[in-house]
A protein has these predicted regions:
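Local sequence-structure signature of Cys/Sec-based thiol-disulfide redox active-site neighborhoods
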Residues: 1-24, 28-36
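Thiol/selenol-based redox catalytic cores and closely related redox-interacting motifs
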Residues: 33-112
Length: 112
C-alpha cells in the first residue's frame, strides 16, 4: 500500500497520524511540505478531495486573515498556499482509498 503524508514534524497531530500509519505496518512517503511545498496541481487535487481550498486552509497561527483569505475563492487561496506553504493545514494523507485532512488524527484510520 502506498501512502503519502504531508507532514510537519513540529505538529502533534501530524506526528500522531504518522505513528498511526506506521503502527498499521506501512512506512509512508513523508513530504515535509514546509521544506518541499506541493506544486499548484497537487494543491488543487488535494483541495478538491478535502472539500475545497477553504477546507485545506490553515487559519490559526498563519497570516490567512490578514491576507484576506477567509471567504476567498479557491484560486486565490491555492495561489497563496503555493507561495506560502504555512497556509496549508496538516496533516494531509494521500492513499489508494482516498485523500483526507487528518484532523482529528483518527480520521487517518479510514485509509489504512
Amino acid at each position: 500500500m502506498s501512502i503519502t503524508i504531508w507532514h510537519n514534524p513540529k505538529c502533534g497531530t501530524s506526528r500522531n497520524v504518522l505513528a498511526l500509519i506506521r503502527a498499521s505496518g506501512v512506512e509512508p512517503a513523508i513530504v515535509e511540505y514546509l521544506i518541499t511545498p506541493p506544486d499548484a496541481d497537487a494543491l488543487a487535487r488535494v483541495a478538491a478531495a478535502v472539500g475545497g481550498a477553504a477546507a485545506l486552509l490553515r487559519i490559526n497561527g498563519t497570516p490567512a486573515s490578514e491576507m484576506g483569505l477567509i471567504g476567498a475563492d479557491d484560486a486565490t487561496i491555492l495561489a497563496a498556499m503555493a507561495v506560502n506553504p504555512m497556509l496549508i493545514n496538516r496533516p494531509v494523507v494521500l492513499a489508494p482509498k482516498g485523500t483526507i485532512l487528518a484532523r482529528p488524527a483518527e480520521r487517518a484510520l479510514a485509509l489504512l
